[in-house]
Amino acid sequence: MVIRSQVGGDQLNLLARGWLLAARGQFIPYGNPMSTGGKAPGGITTVLVGLPLMLWRDHRAPAVLVLLFHIAAYWLLDGALKRHLAPRERVLLALLYWLNPWQLFFATFLWNPNYLFFFGSLHLWSALAQRERARFWPSFLHVAGLVLAFQIHPSCLLLVVASGLLWLRRFFRVHWPGAILGGLAAALPLIPWALEVITHPAIVTAAKKGFLGRGLLYGLPRGVSYWLRYASLSVSWRLDDFNFSEILGGSDRWLGPGLHLLATTVLGLTVLFPLLANLRLWRVRKRLPVAPGRLARLRAWGLAVWRRRLVPGTTGRAWVKGYVRICFVAGLIVFSLSPTTVMMWQGVILFHAAILPVVLWAGPLARTRLAARTIRWSRVYLVAEVVFLIAIAFGTPYYRCAGHKPEDSFNFNLKYDSPMFRELNIQQTCPWPMNVPGGWWPDVLPPG
């Protein structure tokens, strides 16, 4: 999938920053344009894209680093949870995390949100490592990860809010000298950005689109749906936009549309599994005497969940369950306050937490009378994942050159030309229309 990965508008903006650093030694101290306007703070994306291009002058080099970030994310997550999950549950973790079409889609091409999976796993690991006592390096890495993630994508606010709630509920302790030093070290890339803001304040003041709380009106259900869909085969956006004309050598009249229909119907039903798992995770077993009325019952249930189910348990497994609940609450808060409509990539930093309810629910089922059925369904799910991944690798817009639509953000008209397109093998892989009046152009790439 890395070899077949293509570049669109966002990728060209990122590659322009990395290429200018690798080829011309020019450091761009700010990131890609944001959906709310302005530029992302800090030049960490320039470094993340530029360093791989120094080793391999190809547009797929940064995607290799993205894949390494995802490998490290899974290794860190599995290492953190191996003492708290049964062997079969670790197999489910591999099935639902590593072989997940959502995860492998984000793991194999260049994009800002694709780096965030690692910071999500780092967040869980560093918090769990301080469940009983504060430690220097976990606190250092916890805060450093938050600050670096902030410079990559603003959706890191999900982890920031989760950290605050975890700390308030005493899910982890903080080694304050380590936390402060971690924040200062990770903030070093912000110094050139701050100097640039003084000279060109428009990169900050341009961020005026949307309004605080828009998510409560438009996007909260979307955010919750993505939380559930991350642990399923119910994909969205362009993951099911299949077109195999490039492979078939002609038009694709039935295979792509047929798989799209299958993905939106049969595979879409797999979201029922994470829905049931999340309902079980939030279940309150003991009924409390409450006053009549729906509002009173809802309030009593909320208090019971918060007081009983979100306090740290005596076991690591109870801690993990509480961590997942708090991440979900953090998602509700941030999605509600979001100034823009919640999109699928804005929640992937919580991907590691979103898949855990199914692991914690299906794992114990394998030790009951439903064991044979659970194993059988897991094998069916594995086959469906592998087939779906092959279809994504050969049929979706990010992994094919032919059959693009205008809304795909691929191969649209470019206003100028640049040596970058040939040095990074972009034109050799999938050529773009160049020197078209009225076309688009990467924000920092000089023409010519």
Task: Locate each region found by the language model.
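Transmembrane-lumen/periplasm boundary regions of multi-pass, lipid-linked membrane glycan transferases
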Residues: V160-F273, N278-L281
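Signature aromatic-anchored transmembrane alpha helix within multi-pass, membrane-resident enzymes
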Residues: G183, A187, A362-R400
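Transmembrane-helix motifs of polytopic, lipid-linked glycan transferases
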Residues: V64-L85, L122, L272-A277
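Short helix- or helix-capping micro-motifs
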Residues: L93-L99, L146, F150
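Short acidic/glycine- and proline-prone juxtamembrane loop motifs at membrane-interface regions
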Residues: W102-Y115
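Hydrophobic/aromatic-rich transmembrane helices and adjacent perimembrane loops
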Residues: F106-A107, L158, K321-L370
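Membrane-interface transmembrane helices that cradle and orient dolichyl/undecaprenyl
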Residues: H84-P87, S121-L141, A149
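Extracytosolic helix-loop segments that constitute the early lumenal/periplasmic catalytic or substrate-binding loops
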Residues: L12-V47, L55, R214-Y218
